Amino acid sequence: MSGLVTGRHYKTGRPVEVSLAGGVISAVTELPEHPSMAEWPWLAPGLIDVQVNGGWGLDLNTLPLTPDTVSALSRRLLERGVTGYCPTLITNGEPQLAQAASAIAAAVRRDAAAGAAVLGIHLEGPFLSPEDGPRGAHPKEHIRPPDWDAFLRWQEAAEGLIRIVTVSPEWPEAPDFISRCRAAGVIVSIGHTAATPEQIREAVAAGAAMSTHLGNGTHLILPRHPNYVWEQLAADELYGCMIADGQHLPPSLLKVILRTKQNRAILVSDAVSLSGMPAGAYRLHIGGEVVLTGEGRLHLAGSPGLLAGSTMMLPDQAAYLVRTGLARLDEALDYASVHPARLLGLDQAAGLAAGAPADLIRFRLNAGAFEGIECWKHGRKLPHGSGNGNGNSHVVGG
């Protein structure tokens, strides 16, 4: 596909004309300022989310998973500017995970939207901590030590699509498993862990490259030092993924993660099926009875202080960082596009520049929210959704 897209470059603020040809950006030309351009929207790379469990009532972890569910979720995400994502499967039994992985692979084979948007599967479990707190909502009966043979069976069911696996380094089997994953080109992320600092360092030495929703999936009370959060913050080798929805992490911790990780900071939605749904009472297969408030907070019905998942999609999380002064617009967008692309080894890491894939978003920033999001994938303009990032009107913070 070929064409021209105009807007303000998200890094410079200058008006530009982006030329698209053959699915890539062939040129980015800066234009002279003119009064008619004063209200031009912003142009930025398409967003990449490496942890998505569902949205708009579509759940990747309600089984049996169908390819149609994956395809529908892929279309919804593309419409809202998420041009690539990792469908995330959480802890379950071996046959259940194999079935879900197979359904995702089938969707990628059969459906254009899924084939374009799915970058690989994120397997979040079952190789996690069995301890309350770090385990989070993952079912304890399915938690198990890292098992390479089991992983290979899931990878076969996934037709090779598993790209990321979250592992707790507290298991004795973890270093060897991490080394095998690294050799196979699979990214290992540290998460849902009660590991000692020594075990964290050993995991990094074996090849772990990322932290899953850093600061969440922890004990309620940690030692001042040492502890597994500080150790991951201090590991320069690790990309730090964070949920910036105004609910999961306080601004002070988000600021610390952003300052320590810098060009290895990544925004993730960790969105569940209720993302984009109206406020009300719901029932989830994990968590049971839950309440979604008008502010986008999802909590257990009987325990308002306990979160039951994230409901804010990636565009809104980037806007939250800008609105609260935690990041500039260009920084927030890089956390949600360039940085995850670099982690995954994708050409999209070049950003909005000549030679990069023609995956773009164009939007307006109004009252601290991204509005009127338009999306191009492989140089083709896609239909867009309801105009904001997640289908809701939640504005948190600021």
Language model region names:
Residues M1-P45, N388-N390, H394-V396:
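Histidine-rich, glycine-flanked metal-binding segment
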Residues Y10-E17, G325-L333, R342-K377:
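Acidic, glycine-enriched loop/beta-strand segments at the rims
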Residues N53-D59, S71-A100, A117-S129, A158-E170, ...:
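Divalent metal-dependent hydrolysis catalytic cores, especially in the metallo-beta-lactamase
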Residues S129-E156:
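Conserved phosphate-binding/catalytic loop of the ribokinase/pfkB sugar-kinase fold
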